[in-house]
UniProtKB/Swiss-Prot annotation:
InterPro entries: Ribosomal_Su5_D2-typ_SF (IPR020568), Ribosomal_uS5 (IPR000851), Ribosomal_uS5_bac-type (IPR005712), Ribosomal_uS5_C (IPR005324), Ribosomal_uS5_N (IPR013810), Ribosomal_uS5_N_CS (IPR018192), Ribsml_uS5_D2-typ_fold_subgr (IPR014721). One of its GO terms (biological process) is translation. Keywords: Ribonucleoprotein, Ribosomal protein, RNA-binding, rRNA-binding. With S4 and S12 plays an important role in translational accuracy. Located at the back of the 30S subunit body where it stabilizes the conformation of the head with respect to the body. NCBIfam families: rpsE_bact (TIGR01021). One of its GO terms (cellular component) is small ribosomal subunit. Residues 17-80 form the S5 DRBM domain. Belongs to the universal ribosomal protein uS5 family. Signal peptide: none annotated. Pfam families: Ribosomal_S5, Ribosomal_S5_C. The N-terminal domain interacts with the head of the 30S subunit; the C-terminal domain interacts with the body and contacts protein S4. The interaction surface between S4 and S5 is involved in control of translational fidelity. It comes from Treponema pallidum (strain Nichols). This is Small ribosomal subunit protein uS5.
Length: 172
């Protein structure tokens, strides 16, 4: 009986998240009888209200790899501070060979970003962001660099509270 109740709650929780598959990769291991294929999937999951996470899953089947990556993405959710559909300030982050620059944009600009960064911004709920990816264009490295940049973003209310100042004094 309890199992059915939990299943219903999970279904409701799943409806609030948007999932995007960033990369699906097939690898082959050559064995005595031929080739054995396995798949890896990189996905981002977000609620389009500022929560976003990424996951990487591997399995012998495509659907299983995607399911694993979505599960891991839901467990690694982080808060994405948004201010009027954009990020509060300019930020950059590097992960291994990838460098990602994120800049706030005026309303109506849209998401100007490469495929990997665009997917993250869309599931996070950002509507106006400028982005540039430099260096390695490896999907996992760009995702980790983007999440590093997101981690550096400061929420105006939280920062004002920490400094003991009024919100108007901080950002106007």
């Amino acid at each position: 009986m309890d199992r059915h109740r939990d299943f219903g709650k999970d279904r409701l929780r799943d409806k609030e998240f948007t999932e995007k598959l960033i990369k699906l990769n097939r690898t082959a291991k050559v064995v005595k009888g031929g080739r054995r294929f396995s798949f890896s999937a990189l996905t981002v999951v977000g609620d389009q209200k500022g929560r976003v996470g990424f996951g990487f899953g591997k399995a012998g089947d495509v659907s299983e790899a995607i399911r694993k990556s979505v599960e891991r993405a839901k467990r690694s959710m982080v808060l994405f501070p948004l201010k009027d559909g954009t990020i509060p300030h300019e930020v950059q982050a590097k992960f291994k060979g990838s460098l990602v620059l994120l800049r706030p944009a005026c309303s109506g600009t849209g998401i100007i970003a490469g495929g990997t960064v665009r997917a993250i911004m869309e599931v996070a709920g950002a509507t106006d962001v400028l982005s540039k990816s430099l260096g390695s264009n490896s999907a996992i490295n760009v995702v980790r660099a983007t999440f590093g940049a997101v981690a550096q973003l400061m929420d105006a209310r939280k920062l004002a509270r920490e400094r003991g100042k009024a919100l108007v004094d901080m950002w106007g």
